[in-house]
Amino acid sequence: MESITISQLKNWKRNKKKIAAITAYDFSFSRLFSNCGIPVILIGDSLGMTIQGHTSTLPVKIEDIAYHTKAVRKGAPNTFLISDLPFMSYYDTKQALKNTAKIIRSGANMIKMEGGKWLIEIIRELSNRLILICGHIGLIPQSFHYLGGYKVQGRKENDANKLIDEALLLEEAGINMLILECIPEKLAKKITESLSIPVIGIGSGKNTDGQILVMHDLLGITEGKTPSFTKNFLSESDSIQKAIQKYIYEVEHSIYPSKKHSF
């Protein structure tokens, strides 16, 4: 697979080619995903739960993300890598610049930050320094205490309008991609059509420019109850490789997510 670039991903949006993304945290799985044709991998702070055994993403540190980014880059040299900036690692511009540099040096193509209007000035500073940025709005796990838990966001008209405004402001400030998590399908469609950058959904319906899932959910190895928007692709396949290929196919052909995976 040739190296995936942000220019290609923007072309995919224009050409209505769906983007199938997944999380990964190590060499072996990232190599497998890359060989299957996954174009985008997120080194997510979800590793706090899936790898470290915490009950949330909050304990994850920048050093953890850097370590796992290096491992994933070795396994997926040509895949487009997005790495999370974890909780309280970008509370001001100076800290955001310092930690972004650490993550980019570790092999990421792009960094991801959760939040809305309060991030605008930080995003502008990073964008002015030609850093690729992925925004993340809707359900933002780093703020689950404030949100009252892991709940669908944007159901009420005022909340929906706020998310639309935030998406537009983030794009104007300089983000190059946006993740929408756990918002109603119609709202996600409206936001996706309003932006010129790729919009990736998780629990936000099929009308975004692509989908992302936590690998443990996709493979059915998550402990306990999984979110209703996830699908166990391994249960319908006889190997991990075929499960990943099925995921890619279903995303690219708008089979997944179906209505039962949407809000």
Curated annotation (Swiss-Prot):
Organism, as annotated: Buchnera aphidicola subsp. Acyrthosiphon pisum (strain 5A)
Any matching Pfam family: Pantoate_transf
Gene name of this polypeptide: panB
GO CC, alphabetical: cytoplasm
Catalytic activity as recorded in UniProt: 3-methyl-2-oxobutanoate + (6R)-5,10-methylene-5,6,7,8-tetrahydrofolate + H2O = 2-dehydropantoate + (6S)-5,6,7,8-tetrahydrofolate
Keyword annotations: Cytoplasm, Magnesium, Metal-binding, Pantothenate biosynthesis, Transferase
Presence of keyword Cytoplasm: yes
Molecular function GO labels: 3-methyl-2-oxobutanoate hydroxymethyltransferase activity; magnesium ion binding
Binding positions for 3-methyl-2-oxobutanoate per the UniProt entry: D45, S46, D84, K112
Active site: E181
GO biological process: pantothenate biosynthetic process
SUPFAM superfamilies: Phosphoenolpyruvate/pyruvate domain
Subunit structure: Homodecamer; pentamer of dimers.
Known role: Catalyzes the reversible reaction in which hydroxymethyl group from 5,10-methylenetetrahydrofolate is transferred onto alpha-ketoisovalerate to form ketopantoate.
EC annotation from Swiss-Prot or TrEMBL: 2.1.2.11
Binding residues annotated for Mg(2+), in chain numbering: D45, D84, E114
Entry keyword Cytoplasm: yes
Pathway involvement of the protein, from the record: Cofactor biosynthesis; (R)-pantothenate biosynthesis; (R)-pantoate from 3-methyl-2-oxobutanoate: step 1/2
Record-stated family: Belongs to the PanB family.
Cofactor(s) needed: Mg(2+)
Compartments where found: Cytoplasm
HAMAP family in the record: PanB
Cofactor binding note of this UniProt entry: Binds 1 Mg(2+) ion per subunit.
Disulfide bond sites: none
Official protein name in the record: 3-methyl-2-oxobutanoate hydroxymethyltransferase
